Amino acid sequence: MKIKQLILTCCSLLFILTSCNNYLDVKPKGKIIPKTAEEYSTILHYWLDEIEKGANATIIPEPDYTSLLEFFAEDLDGTLASSLVNTQLYVGSRINTNQKRYPELYSVIKDCNVIISNMEDTESEMAKNILGTAWSLRSICYYNLLQSFCEPYQPETATETLGLPLVDEFDMEAKPERSNQKETAEFILKGFRNALLYNVTDKDYLFTAQVTKAFMARFFFWTQDWENAIIYAKEVLEQYPMLEAEEYADNINQKLSKGKNVIIASYTNENDIGSLSYVVAQSNVIQRPVSKELVQLFNSSPNDIRKANSFNAQRI
């Protein structure tokens, strides 16, 4: 009897110890762990969809955020509205809202890092489009962070001026310190160059090679690398040439579509969020007339259609 009990005890222990391995192999219920390029593309297309809906102001500014930046600039005169709720005159009234941009941009960076570090498929056409877009999008987010949260870039002091915490892989426990601005700029440039290696041409991914080059031109301009800024700007202009005055006016005022020489735009799909943002921006901006000093900077010649295209006789 004791021998039988001993055998049963040993069998039970063996079963329990064997089960421990399976017990530790936990997979979260209700969540899909990406494996294929198609599954990783859903991570990326979430952000691309937000841009097209005009629901994300941190990557590509949507109408409401763009109008807000105009309110804080020096191009508009004091409000004509009886209420100042939606037509702020002073950036300090919204200064705390800028903090939201920081975690939002790093959230996009996190998703890009997940794709870059973990997607096994690197050879299929879809995988190349996904990787090229992820590299470009990550650098654009860091470029936006560099502009918003760091001192204006000066090459002479870039090694002594604080830049950004640089994260190149998904690690929830990582706490990177801030790099200097030169290191940040080099990190951004590396991402752009990696994006160009994939030569994305599928416009469904928004950030094609030409769009990446356009952002590179802006990045080089911001970091005062004038020679490279000119090189990349010329490359982009070959694909998106300047238009004649009438054609430009028609293209720039198109709603829910990207004009002929518009490189990238938000709010290109009709939806409730984007439509509300557009309506609010339109109703608010007409309450602030353009400053007379700005109007006087434009020519009155037929070839300069900026004045006629941007505001009316009441300067709105």
Language-model features: where?
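Bacterial Sec-dependent N-terminal signal peptides
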Residues: 1-28
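Membrane-proximal, proline-rich intrinsically disordered regions
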Residues: 20-66, 233, 298-302, 306-309
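Elongated scaffold/linker segments in the mid-to-C-terminal portions of large proteins
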Residues: 44, 48, 80, 238-316
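Conserved, well-structured interaction surfaces
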Residues: 80-148, 194-200
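Short coil/turn linker motifs that delimit alpha-helical repeat modules in TPR/alpha-solenoid proteins
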Residues: 127, 181, 204-205
